[in-house]
């Protein structure tokens, strides 16, 4: 059973780094500063994280997962396509609310690790809520469908991150969401994927 004190101290440290990164600037808080803000000791910090970067990564992944979780998933593959623009728009709006935070975690030393986590998370959601779920569960090469989902998730993540980091010159969220959603829907509906799946099932 998890010690509630450990759970609480981890939450306090995550809240401390999240608050620090929510403000403009590039300075990274020290372990001493974070411990003071969270009200925990340095040994407690090291019980959870090896360094500040690993704490930043954990906080970023937690916030990204919460953002994805706030978007209501569709109930069937048939409803997925018309819902994609709304879902993508909601994600972009959510990123903008904490633009300073995401800019800092997506341009610093944690950028790759955070993006890899987001790609894996998005790929899993595609395999769960999109028409890929039906193809993945049918007889055939599951690994191929999973790789395709990862490919789509990586491309989507790249476009979203690029849009966010454009700063004041970025296009309106609605316009960007429309384009990203169209590419995502086209990819999932790809006849090439259907052909690959059909061939692998033989």
Give each language-model segment a name.
Residues 9, 56-63, 84, 110, ...:
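Hydrophobic/aromatic residues within well-ordered alpha-helical segments
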Residues 35:
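The alpha-helix within a helix-turn-helix
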Residues 71-101, 111:
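Hydrophobic alpha-helical connector segments
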Residues 107, 129-202:
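Hydrophobic/aromatic-rich alpha-helical bundle segments in the mid-to-C-terminal region
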């Amino acid at each position: 059973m998890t010690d509630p004190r450990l759970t609480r101290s981890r939450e306090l440290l995550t809240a401390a780094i999240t608050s620090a990164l929510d403000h403009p600037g590039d300075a990274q808080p020290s372990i001493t500063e974070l411990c003071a803000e969270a009200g925990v000791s340095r040994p407690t910090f090291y019980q959870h994280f090896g360094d500040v970067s690993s704490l930043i990564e954990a906080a970023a992944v937690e916030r990204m997962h919460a953002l994805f979780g706030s978007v209501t998933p569709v109930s069937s593959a048939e409803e997925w396509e018309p819902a994609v623009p709304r879902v993508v728009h909601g994600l972009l709006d959510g990123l903008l609310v904490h633009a300073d935070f995401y800019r800092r975690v997506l341009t610093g030393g944690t950028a790759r690790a955070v993006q890899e986590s987001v790609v894996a998370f998005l790929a899993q959601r595609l395999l769960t809520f999109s028409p890929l779920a039906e193809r993945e569960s049918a007889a055939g090469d599951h690994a191929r469908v999973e790789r395709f989902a990862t490919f789509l998730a990586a491309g989507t993540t790249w476009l979203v991150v690029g849009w966010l980091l454009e700063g004041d010159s970025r296009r309106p969220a609605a316009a960007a969401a429309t384009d990203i959603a169209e590419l995502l829907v086209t990819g999932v509906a790809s006849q090439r994927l259907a052909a690959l799946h059909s061939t692998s099932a033989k």
